[in-house]
Swiss-Prot record:
GO terms for molecular function: anthranilate phosphoribosyltransferase activity; magnesium ion binding. InterPro entries: Anthranilate_Pribosyl_Tfrase, Glycosyl_Trfase_fam3, Glycosyl_Trfase_fam3_N_dom, Glycosyl_Trfase_fam3_N_dom_sf, Nuc_phospho_transferase. The gene is trpD. It holds the Pfam family Glycos_transf_3. This is Anthranilate phosphoribosyltransferase. Its cofactor is Mg(2+). 5-phospho-alpha-D-ribose 1-diphosphate binds at residues 79, 82-83, 87, 89-92, 106-114, 118. Anthranilate 2 binds at residue 164. Mg(2+) 1 binds at residues 91, 224. Anthranilate 1 binds at residues 79, 109. Mg(2+) 2 binds at residues 223-224.
Length: 343
């Protein structure tokens, strides 16, 4: 494959096959293409519009180059990020809450465009995010939760990171993170920053082995379930795709403005989540609970979002103790104790 020829084709609007996309991604992952050419290819893909086959090809390459695990009977809540709104770490809080009743392998990274990434949030709690493959399975079996740090499990991404940083725009790699959990989680809630990508990601997911994937995009532009307006939902169940909208104000009553859910940094996000779990921040509590309701539905533990919302109250109330248990087994519990003591 000649990368220059690929760039020429992409600029002419010609899409790649799944096999071609994987071969191209392999070359990028291996550092075999000069950075200026990689930048051109990523921008050309973006301008043309990434197809499901191109996404699948890149996903398969990333999975092949990742450190390997087999923890398929798990749930993940990793999303695309990049909505630019800066809400509290609701997907990570959701993962922690749901892990009380279903095994969770949370895939995540440090903040790129947000104020607090999942890795930053967990570190602020005292959780050790550097969990190698040889320890991940035992940690999951003991605690029903493990965090898989993207920088550790996708070492080949170091060949792409400088280009992505210089470009400063979303590329195909923003879509790949949530689809490349090294655990191979068969169930996932995936927040998507852009509504047009929902269908593309769903079509790609049909060929990626999910038992249940629920993609969500909430008004006004959230890559999460929205407490303010409608949430656009695409369910992938085996070979079936279903699209619909849901207004969670039917469950929570008065809508919650997104402006009440923003955070300034990881520690602030941690404090807001803990306050919510203690019943002292109603807006954040509702935000977490509706996201937990969708995760419980995705895990197959409830039949609808309303039942999930009812169960979520108990799980959210248990969060402080749940977090302390997880951190005590893998991290520095003095951090979470100090934060709890300051609230």
């Amino acid at each position: 494959m000649d990368p220059k020829e690929v760039l020429k084709r992409l600029t002419e609007g010609v899409s790649l096959s799944q096999e071609e996309a994987k071969e191209l991604a392999d070359l990028i992952m291996e550092g075999s293409i000069p950075e200026p050419l990689v930048a051109g290819i990523l921008v050309a893909l973006k301008m043309k519009g990434e197809t499901p086959d191109e996404i699948i090809g890149f996903v398969n390459s990333m999975r092949q180059h990742a450190l390997k695990l087999d923890l398929r009977n798990t749930l993940d809540t990793a999303g695309t990020g990049g909505d630019g709104i800066g809400t509290i770490n609701v997907s990570t809080a959701t993962a922690l809450a749901v892990s009380s009743v279903f095994p969770v392998a949370k895939h995540g990274n440090r903040a790129a465009s947000s104020r607090s990434g999942s890795a930053d949030f967990l570190e602020s709690l005292g959780y050790n995010i550097q969990v190698p493959p040889e320890k991940a399975k035992d940690l999951l079996s003991r605690n029903n939760f493990v965090f898989l740090f993207a920088q550790l499990y996708h070492p080949s991404m170091k060949n792409v990171a400088p280009v992505r940083k210089v470009l400063g725009v979303r590329t195909i790699f923003n879509l790949l993170g949530p689809l490349t959990n090294p655990a191979g989680s068969e169930r996932q809630v995936m927040g998507v920053y852009s509504l047009p990508f929902m269908r593309k990601l769903a079509e790609a997911a049909l060929k990626l082995g999910y038992v249940k994937l629920v993609l969500v995009h909430g008004e006004p532009g959230l890559d999460e379930v929205s407490p303010q307006g409608k949430t656009y939902i695409t369910e992938v169940t085996g070979s079936k795709v279903e699209e619909y909208t849901y207004d969670f104000s039917e469950i929570i009553g008065q809508p919650v403005p997104v402006s009440r859910l923003t955070t300034t940094d990881p520690l602030d996000s941690v404090r807001r989540v803990l306050m919510a779990s203690m019943g002292r921040d109603e807006a954040v509590e509702k935000f977490i609970r509706i996201n937990v309701s969708v995760a419980l539905y995705t895990a197959g533990l409830v039949s609808d979002f309303k039942d999930g919302f009812e169960l979520s109250e108990e799980l959210v109330r248990k969060l402080p103790d749940r977090i302390e248990t997880l951190v005590r087994d893998n991290g520095d519990p003095s951090k979470i104790k100090a934060i709890k003591g300051s609230l």
